[in-house]
Amino acid sequence: MVSTKTYTTRASTHPSPVAQRLFHLMDTKKANLCASVDVQTTSEFLSLIDKLGPYICLVKTHIDIIDDFSYEGTIVPLLELARKHNFMIFEDRKFADIGNTVKHQYTSGVYKISSWSDITNAHGVTGAGVVDGLKQGALETTKEPRGLLMLAELSSKGSLAYGEYTEKTVEIAKLDKEFVIGFIAQRDMGGHDEGFDWIVMTPGVGLDDKGDGLGQQYRTVDEVVSTGTDVIIVGRGLFGKGRDPEVEGKRYRDAGWNAYLKRTGQ
């Protein structure tokens, strides 16, 4: 059953401080838009985020595709923009290894993801140890609250993430109510009758295009929100093909918010 509760109501009862903060932020900014900023230079990355910042609740990064990455040059100004525009950060790392390995991938190396990203995500393919490893890494490296999304479903054509795989991933999520805050999925993932209130974030959302020729399949904002999506993830629809990120940011923010108001009967 799709939740018709408001973000504020959900914030008041959610066990995760990360989810609480995100719900309050979305309500304050009247925005449930996550900008997926996949570009290869720090300057373009920061410039786009600065333009999109007023319209988003979350920025989604693939930090390892930035050619000139440095912590001081890329992450420090990203955190400044997050404070300036009041949005949270989601590193789309898609962890998929044993617990000890993902712990080090999350906390160490060049990127030190746990030190700056509010939210990250993981596949369920290696079992529940991936959750334990990431949670341990967060607790050992930062005093800031962190949250994890499990990859239950994907938007790409031919994805193997469906059926029993999705069901098993949901079972893994149930093992940690505070650290696992929700899913990357195409619809509501249930759990309400067991006391879970998972945040559903959905990629592959577009107001104009139906696909990209490389397997991506787009669904409309109204379509995904009406079936349980809480946060719409949009990338090239905001800045690709000569689009103006400020114009498109406002357009998608308004579309997402209006769909949320419709779902919650406001």
From Swiss-Prot:
GO terms for cellular component: cytosol. GO terms for molecular function: orotidine-5'-phosphate decarboxylase activity. Pathway: Pyrimidine metabolism; UMP biosynthesis via de novo pathway; UMP from orotate: step 2/2. Substrate binds at residues 38, 60-62, 92-101, 218, 236. SMART domains: OMPdecase. It comes from the Eukaryota. The keyword Lyase applies. InterPro entries: Aldolase_TIM, OMPdecase, OMPdecase_AS, OMPdeCOase_dom, RibuloseP-bd_barrel. Keywords: Decarboxylase, Lyase, Pyrimidine biosynthesis. The active site is at K94. It catalyses: orotidine 5'-phosphate + H(+) = UMP + CO2. PROSITE patterns: OMPDECASE. Pfam families: OMPdecase. One of its GO terms (biological process) is 'de novo' pyrimidine nucleobase biosynthetic process. This is Orotidine 5'-phosphate decarboxylase. The gene is URA3.
